[in-house]
Amino acid sequence: MRGERGRGRGRFGSRVGPNTGFRPFVPHIPFDFHVCEMAFPRVKPAPDDSSFSESLLKRNQDLAPSTAEQASILSLVTKINNVIDNLIVAPGNFEVQIEEVRQVGSYKKGTMSTGHNVADLVVILKILPTLEAVSALGIKVVETLRTQDPAEVLTMLTNETGFEISSADATVKILITTVPPNLRKLDPELHLDIKVLQSALAAIRHARWFEENASHSTVKVLIRLLKDLRSRFPGFEPLTPWILDLLGHYAVMNNPTRQPLALNVSYKRCLQMLAAGLFLPGSVGITDPCESGNFRVHTVMTLEQQDMVCYTAQTLVRILSHGGFRKILGLEGDASALATEMSTWDGVIVTPSEKAYEKPPERKEGEEDENQDIPEGAEEEESMETQE
């Protein structure tokens, strides 16, 4: 009976009973140079990164919304916000009771990019969110706006998350949710999907957390650059906007000195952490600060997606270390093939990393599941097979 004295992984061991047959899940911490920099004293001066820093700022300048875009989206958001505020204060005969309206998303956070002039508002209803109520609110808002300014051409479309109002060069998406006690009273046939409502409430929590913790300008610039990176490299597509927000904040602010790192250092650090397996199964990852229960944000991705993010980052880290930053940043033509095809940098050939995860073959009917006794907590750690 070897189970009496724990042989499991982890600092405290594990007490495995004779009939349990599983090990507790102990996440590992991927290597991050900036957390343990004192253990690696420099033997030569740091390389000159001024050209890389200039390129990052140039790319951010290219990606930032123009003055005209900012003015048009601000104007539309302000008008819609005022109309909804008036409905809250003085609804009159209007039956759709509103609790509050909040700005969320990249508009609120200051991480919008040019060419995507879309802002998000969350409207919290006091009543149950029926499709009729959503449509009535959308019609009421757009008709009020048209009355205020008949010359402005506006369109209103309802969708599964609420509705959106568009002018010639800006769009405001209104995400509908309800007060939390109403979530228990929903009828799937009459009301908006509960996942949509919960997602809108989460967006409010995200915006509030960002405002309190991630308002540093370096964090905002880095997030805009990461969103651009995600849009140009298919391997990063699984990274959600919220994951990118948290990754950007972590890379800039999470270090022993608690002082924000420079943009060039933070950008490299993002790729280095992803390449080291920050978002792989078994990794401690980044805990969602807006959810309870130590939820690690990368677990929303499938195992294949987690592996794809890792091996894409590994390839880009190697290219970055050999001076290929202009190509990675999108300053020198299309770079989407960089992560999948061999490239040469100053005589050094960089071969793309290969995937490590192989999807297990589907079981035929009647076959028993060998892992059926493994509890849920240990599943993730056991389920990623690697090819040595």
From Swiss-Prot:
<keyword id="KW-0539">Nucleus</keyword>
<comment type="subunit">
    <text>Forms heterodimers with ILF3.</text>
</comment>
<feature type="domain" description="DZF">
    <location>
        <begin position="23"/>
        <end position="370"/>
    </location>
</feature>
<dbReference type="InterPro" id="IPR049402">
    <property type="entry name" value="DZF_dom_C"/>
</dbReference>
<comment type="function">
    <text>May regulate transcription of undefined genes.</text>
</comment>
<keyword id="KW-0804">Transcription</keyword>
<feature type="region of interest" description="Disordered">
    <location>
        <begin position="349"/>
        <end position="388"/>
    </location>
</feature>
<dbReference type="GO" id="GO:0003677">
    <property type="term" value="F:DNA binding"/>
</dbReference>
<dbReference type="Pfam" id="PF20965">
    <property type="entry name" value="DZF_C"/>
</dbReference>
<dbReference type="Pfam" id="PF07528">
    <property type="entry name" value="DZF_N"/>
</dbReference>
<dbReference type="GO" id="GO:0005634">
    <property type="term" value="C:nucleus"/>
</dbReference>
<protein>
    <recommendedName>
        <fullName>Interleukin enhancer-binding factor 2 homolog</fullName>
    </recommendedName>
</protein>
<dbReference type="InterPro" id="IPR049401">
    <property type="entry name" value="DZF_dom_N"/>
</dbReference>
<keyword id="KW-0805">Transcription regulation</keyword>
<feature type="compositionally biased region" description="Basic and acidic residues">
    <location>
        <begin position="355"/>
        <end position="366"/>
    </location>
</feature>
<dbReference type="InterPro" id="IPR043519">
    <property type="entry name" value="NT_sf"/>
</dbReference>
<dbReference type="InterPro" id="IPR052134">
    <property type="entry name" value="ILF2"/>
</dbReference>
<keyword id="KW-0010">Activator</keyword>
<feature type="compositionally biased region" description="Acidic residues">
    <location>
        <begin position="367"/>
        <end position="388"/>
    </location>
</feature>
<keyword id="KW-0238">DNA-binding</keyword>
<dbReference type="InterPro" id="IPR006561">
    <property type="entry name" value="DZF_dom"/>
</dbReference>
<dbReference type="GO" id="GO:0005730">
    <property type="term" value="C:nucleolus"/>
</dbReference>
<dbReference type="GO" id="GO:0045893">
    <property type="term" value="P:positive regulation of DNA-templated transcription"/>
</dbReference>
<dbReference type="GO" id="GO:0003725">
    <property type="term" value="F:double-stranded RNA binding"/>
</dbReference>
